[in-house]
């Protein structure tokens, strides 16, 4: 199996739909036959559990602390989709070295077709570093003016740290007096990967702590995420080709924390990876089964129980 593709889902501010997009793309890619791991990279304000209705016993923070292996912190959403959540307690954030994320991400590449990094908002080391780890950065934005400006800043940030911007996805599209997504992506100087219409099914699904792609797969938003997933699959390089990924290389320049990030990256990414982050093989994944700490979607639209 060729190494998987690492995709960072990013946006400058919270509330633009990063986690919604990361989770729904994960489900859509899995439904298309791909194997997917979603890694929650918001180490301070984790919330992916609210989208998937489960309480993890082990998290990415435990992996970074060296107390559990990566496989023990992966949870099965579906047969082809696993999630590595971050800790939800603020105390979990203490003494976390973001550069230690590199070997964790690298260890997942042999076992999955896609590794989706659900990044944090803002400009901080935990935001910057995932942009360096990804083969491509997927920018998420609404069509509102303030969101577009923030998306422009995120693109500039990704480019300054040698990230590769794969394109932009617009969510809650078709509202207000905003120009069409094609014009907005042109303004941003990024390829348009797709747009997700403003759809009440998304809010309904979130109220049920589920992705809309699972809750109402025939909704306009779910179908849009499906098309975006298809586009990503078609644009991925052949398995025999070298990707454009920059994992472990980076090139932070002219940033406040650049020197510190570069130094900690070198310290945290040794050639002899420890047991918690060694490369995994697909057939050795020891994720918790559904019903034993794993989880399954508990309700779909139209269910009466």
Regions found by a protein language model. Give the residues of each.
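P-loop/Walker-type NTP enzyme "switch/lid" segment
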Residues: 11, 38-110, 205-207, 211
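Conserved C-terminal guanine-recognition region of P-loop GTPase G domains, centered on the G4
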Residues: 149-168
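Hydrophobic anchor at the start of a short beta-strand
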Residues: 36, 115, 137, 165-166, ...
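G-domain G4 guanine-recognition motif of GTPases
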Residues: 12, 142-143, 166-177, 195-202, ...
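Haloarchaeal acidic low-complexity proteome signature biased toward cell-envelope/secretome components but also
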Residues: 1-16, 22-35, 54, 63, ...
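Inter-motif core of Ras-like GTPase G domains
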Residues: 107-114, 121-145
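Beta-strand-loop-alpha "switch" segments that mediate conformational coupling across diverse proteins
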Residues: 184-216
């Amino acid at each position: 199996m060729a190494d998987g593709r690492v995709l960072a889902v990013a946006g400058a501010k919270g509330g633009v739909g990063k986690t919604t997009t990361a989770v729904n793309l994960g489900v859509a890619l899995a439904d298309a036959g791909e194997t997917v791991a979603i890694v929650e990279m918001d180490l301070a304000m984790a919330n992916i559990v609210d989208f998937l209705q489960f309480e993890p016993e082990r998290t990415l923070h435990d992996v970074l602390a060296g107390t559990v292996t990566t496989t023990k912190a992966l949870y099965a959403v579906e047969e082809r989709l696993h999630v590595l959540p971050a800790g939800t307690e603020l105390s979990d954030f203490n003494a976390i070295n973001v550069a230690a994320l590199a070997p964790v991400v690298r260890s997942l590449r042999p076992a999955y077709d896609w590794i989706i990094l659900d990044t944090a908002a803002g400009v901080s080391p935990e935001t910057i570093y995932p942009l360096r780890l990804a083969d491509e950065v997927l920018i998420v934005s609404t069509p509102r003016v303030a969101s577009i400006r923030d998306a422009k800043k995120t693109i500039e940030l990704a480019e300054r740290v040698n990230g590769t911007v794969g394109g932009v996805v617009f969510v809650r599209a078709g509202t207000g007096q905003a120009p069409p997504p094609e014009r907005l992506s042109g303004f941003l100087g990024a390829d348009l990967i797709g747009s997700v219409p403003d759809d009440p099914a998304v809010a309904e699904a979130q109220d049920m702590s589920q992705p809309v792609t699972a809750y109402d797969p025939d909704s306009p938003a779910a179908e849009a995420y499906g098309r975006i997933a298809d586009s990503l699959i078609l644009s991925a390089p052949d398995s025999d080709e070298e990707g454009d990924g920059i994992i472990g290389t980076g090139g932070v320049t002219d940033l406040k924390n650049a020197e510190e990030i570069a130094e900690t990256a070198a310290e945290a990414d040794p050639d002899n990876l420890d047991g918690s982050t060694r490369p995994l093989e697909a057939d050795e994944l020891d994720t918790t089964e559904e019903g034993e700490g794993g989880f399954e979607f508990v309700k779909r639209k139209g269910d009466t129980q």
